[in-house]
Amino acid sequence: MSSAGNKGSDAEQCAAAFLQQQKLTLLEKNYRCRFGEIDLIMREDDTVVFVEVRMRSSDRFGGAAASITAAKQSRLIRTARHYLAGHEGDFPCRFDAVLISGNRENEIEWIRNAFDES
């Protein structure tokens, strides 16, 4: 039986592989700073893509998408700004979500521009 940490890591691995099949390039996994953590940082053409990966075994509490709250979005935005501040250049960026429904044979839903900085 997998622990919650292993399931999260498995979901991130699955999401990274899926996005790489979509021609995105993996830059970093589990980027951490004092503001929070970003599961995956990818690049699509010249755009830096910050990816939140969510796995839910049921939709009982709104499913994976509902778990990305306004507070979580705020932490992701601050963490992304920290990441960008450490890299030279002015890169366009966006925030995507990859939702994995464990109760449907790992059905993957990729939401581009899941939220913005406003």
Swiss-Prot record:
Gene3D superfamilies: 3.40.1350.10. It holds the Pfam family UPF0102. InterPro entries: Restrct_endonuc-II-like (IPR011335), tRNA_endonuc-like_dom_sf (IPR011856), UPF0102_YraN-like (IPR003509). Signal peptide: none annotated. It comes from the Bacteria. GO terms for molecular function: nucleic acid binding. Belongs to the UPF0102 family. HAMAP family: UPF0102 (MF_00048). PANTHER family: UPF0102 PROTEIN YRAN. This is UPF0102 protein NE0719. It comes from Nitrosomonas europaea (strain ATCC 19718 / CIP 103999 / KCTC 2705 / NBRC 14298). The lineage of its organism: Bacteria, Pseudomonadati, Pseudomonadota, Betaproteobacteria, Nitrosomonadales.
